[in-house]
């Protein structure tokens, strides 16, 4: 049975990847269908009730700069906002928000329901329709076929998902939701490498049974940060505190005593878990010398008594979970509302994807999110936006686009995955980006919004606000460069008391701002130097561009050198056995990874500069030396 309409793009799954994919394709004018097993769970925060953080916040800002929904929903749902690494340089500062689950889900659903060109339909997908190496549609659980030339698959943890609590396990996509078994079996027939990964979640605690007086209160920042570039503090709901407590030796003894019934340590779980978000069992085992571990007590919302104890993700049996929770200071009488669990699921080797996130083996089929081996809402949302955008571009007959590593954390994410692959759940850190001074949270819009507008992702309202901000920054920078103060100027009397070294020769306002003891608000407060910019985000941008101009230019010079052969394309059907001079080891690595560009090839572990030179010579001799479209 065929549905009565055809679509341009079909998105399977309504999590963070799926919602951003569907919204991106629809914003670009493609007739888009979002299929989900349950419309009520669209935008669900399945694990921790938070958005952002180190590296992750950068991705949220980039999603926002390209017109995505995650940051907007966070501003409407955030019940505590903090800037992490605020005492460090701007490259590693990151915004993190504690979110009310219900408010976040409601805002995402509101955005989806009001998006032109987007249709929602509640049905699980069991099969893909593939004809002559190209996807042409999908078939749902009830046998209904939907047709489209592009399909974006964002299955999350649902593919052959198996939930573990102690030695008990059962099939599930997450607690309370069925897994996707038929679709997982169908995908296993495709010529794409497959593996198993694992993630977990902590038990949820009843706030009424916690003694918060025995814990350390953690308040949000003042002034309140805002997540979206078009957001405003007035959108934030009521702000509340989180709390901090710690495990202790008694906790650790309880956990050690239960390891014989742990599915992780008894060999029941095959999948590899996230290195940077380990279970409490893993922490006790790997860091045996530590006498305590920090736990963040995070409210799940304004109108719920559920608490998320960030730091004790576990799949231990329920009785062990209850005992370990009650051994922690402030939770001696705690009651568990939902037990913690681990979940195993299928993922596919992202080296079998192009950097557009289209599979190399099936034309028109795109993967995004945890199916590619990543972990985290932010990583999923970023991939979803890219996959939905490129699916739409392909359908419209336009060139696909993926930012380079020097243009966005999204570019770093996709390049890492498609070039190196991953054997464990991948999460983003600022340390993964070699050009992180240029890839700051604060300039994500300046880096990406113009490109987003060109592609069709950015609407008129966002574009107008961005253009106004960009123009005000440029005009203010011009003013600071063009206005000067002399040693005999009347302005000296108000200026010198604020400087470590008095002015001895003429200096521009820009020179003054570059001094370590001076910042933009202080300079603008001095008589004769202001009034400056009213928009604090534009003012921050002016200060950063001035103070870090030397470092920024140096990094840009490095990029210009590195980019010379970065985008030189490598034909996917290139027979590396025919390239004279390559070692058998290098040939094996190239055949295994199938890089799309010289840049990707150069980042494969064990690839030598000599091998890259040999490849370039071969391409030149064969007349294949050309840049890959970006």
Curated annotation (Swiss-Prot):
InterPro entries: FAD/NAD-bd_sf, GIDA_C_N, MnmG, MnmG-rel, MnmG-rel_CS, MnmG_C, MnmG_C_subdom, MnmG_C_subdom_sf. Homodimer. Heterotetramer of two MnmE and two MnmG subunits. Its cofactor is FAD. FAD binds at residues 13-18, 125, 180, 370. It comes from Shewanella woodyi (strain ATCC 51908 / MS32). One of its GO terms (biological process) is tRNA methylation. The keyword Nucleus does not apply. This is tRNA uridine 5-carboxymethylaminomethyl modification enzyme MnmG. Belongs to the MnmG family. One of its GO terms (molecular function) is flavin adenine dinucleotide binding. NAD(+) binds at residues 273-287. It is found in: Cytoplasm. Keywords: Cytoplasm, FAD, Flavoprotein, NAD, tRNA processing. GO terms for cellular component: cytosol. SUPFAM superfamilies: FAD/NAD(P)-binding domain (SSF51905). Its main location: cytoplasm. It holds the Pfam family GIDA_C_1st.
């Amino acid at each position: 049975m065929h549905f009565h309409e055809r679509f341009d793009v079909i998105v399977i799954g309504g999590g963070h990847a799926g919602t951003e994919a569907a919204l991106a394709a629809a914003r670009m004018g493609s007739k888009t269908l979002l299929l989900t097993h349950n419309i009520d769970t669209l935008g669900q925060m399945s694990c921790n009730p938070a958005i952002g953080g180190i590296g992750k916040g950068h991705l949220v800002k980039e999603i926002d700069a390209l017109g995505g929904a995650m940051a907007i929903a966070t501003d409407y749902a955030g019940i505590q906002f903090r800037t992490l690494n605020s005492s460090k340089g701007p490259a590693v500062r990151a915004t993190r928000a504690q979110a009310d689950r219900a408010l976040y889900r409601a805002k995402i659903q509101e955005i989806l329901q009001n998006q032109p060109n987007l249709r929602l339909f509640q049905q699980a997908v069991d099969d893909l329709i593939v004809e002559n190496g190209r996807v042409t549609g999908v078939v749902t659980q009830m046998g209904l076929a939907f047709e489209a030339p592009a399909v974006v698959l964002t299955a999350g943890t649902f593919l052959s998902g198996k939930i573990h609590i102690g030695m008990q396990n059962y099939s599930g996509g997450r607690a309370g939701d069925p897994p996707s078994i038929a679709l997982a079996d169908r995908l296993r027939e495709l010529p794409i490498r497959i593996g198993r990964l694992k993630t977990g979640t902590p038990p949820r605690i009843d706030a009424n049974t916690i003694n918060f007086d025995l814990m350390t209160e953690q308040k949000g920042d003042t002034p309140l940060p805002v997540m979206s570039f078009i957001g405003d503090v007035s959108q934030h709901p009521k702000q509340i505190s989180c709390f901090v407590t710690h495990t202790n030796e008694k906790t650790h003894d309880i956990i050690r005593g239960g390891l014989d019934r742990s599915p992780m340590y008894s060999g029941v779980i095959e999948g590899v878990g996230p290195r940077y978000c380990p279970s409490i069992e893993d922490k006790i085992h790997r860091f045996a010398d530590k006498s305590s571990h920090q736990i963040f007590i995070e409210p799940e919302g304004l109108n719920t008594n559920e608490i998320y104890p960030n730091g004790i993700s576990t799949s231990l049996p329920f009785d062990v979970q209850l005992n370990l929770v009650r051994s922690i200071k402030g939770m001696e009488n705690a009651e568990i509302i939902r037990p913690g669990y681990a979940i195993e699921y299928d993922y596919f080797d992202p080296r079998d994807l192009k950097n557009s996130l289209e599979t190399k083996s099936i034309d028109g089929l795109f993967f995004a999110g945890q199916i590619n081996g990543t972990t985290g809402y932010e990583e999923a949302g970023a991939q979803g936006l890219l996959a939905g955008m490129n699916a739409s571009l392909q359908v419209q007959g336009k060139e696909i686009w993926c930012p380079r590593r020097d243009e966005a954390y999204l570019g770093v994410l996709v390049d890492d995955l498609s070039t190196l692959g991953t054997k464990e759940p991948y999460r983003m850190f600022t340390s993964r980006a070699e050009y992180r001074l240029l890839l700051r949270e604060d300039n994500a819009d300046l880096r990406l919004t113009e490109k987003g507008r060109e592609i069709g992702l950015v609407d008129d309202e966002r574009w107008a606000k961005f253009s106004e901000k960009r123009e005000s920054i440029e005009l203010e920078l011009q003013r600071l460069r063009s206005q000067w103060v002399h040693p005999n100027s009347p302005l000296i009397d108000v200026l010198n008391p604020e400087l470590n070294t008095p002015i001895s020769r003429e200096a521009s306002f820009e020179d003054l701002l570059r001094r370590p003891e001076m910042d933009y608000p202080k300079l603008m407060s001095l008589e004769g130097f202001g009034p400056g910019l009213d928009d604090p985000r534009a003012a921050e941008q002016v200060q950063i561009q001035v103070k870090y101009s030397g470092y920024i230019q140096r990094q840009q010079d490095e990029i210009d050198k590195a980019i010379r052969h970065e985008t030189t394309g490598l034909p996917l059907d290139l027979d590396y056995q025919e390239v004279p001079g390559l070692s058998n080891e290098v040939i094996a690595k190239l055949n295994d990874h199938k890089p799309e560009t010289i840049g990707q090839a150069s980042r494969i572990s064990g690839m030598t500069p000599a091998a890259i030179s040999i490849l370039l010579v071969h391409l030149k001799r064969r007349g294949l030396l050309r840049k890959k479209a970006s």
